[in-house]
Amino acid sequence: MFRNLYAEEARHNQTNITMGKMLKMDPVTYSRKKKNGSFTVTEAKKLTEFFGVSFEYLFETEVET
């Protein structure tokens, strides 16, 4: 769902396991949230701070034309 989130994880060599630990959640929960876009505001803020990018960039979605 969030291609830039996937890209930043790859650039920083992060896995669902390490990201889940950082957000204090199970890796499976993190993976589900990544797929369905259900991050809380607090979780989204932690992710943007961790990767050092803007919310708009990290959570940009593809727009179909």
Task: Describe each model-derived feature in a short phrase.
Residues 1-14, 18:
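A short, Lys/Arg-rich alpha-helix, primarily the initiator
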Residues 10, 21, 49:
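Alpha-helical residues within the helix-turn-helix
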Residues 13-14, 39-42:
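Residue-level signal for the short linker/turn that defines the boundary of a DNA-recognition helix
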Residues 18, 28-29, 57:
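Residues in the helix-turn-helix
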Residues 25-39:
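Recognition helix of helix-turn-helix/homeodomain-like DNA-binding domains
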Residues 34, 43, 62:
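DNA major-groove recognition helix of helix-turn-helix
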Residues 43-57:
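DNA major-groove recognition helix of helix-turn-helix/homeodomain DNA-binding modules
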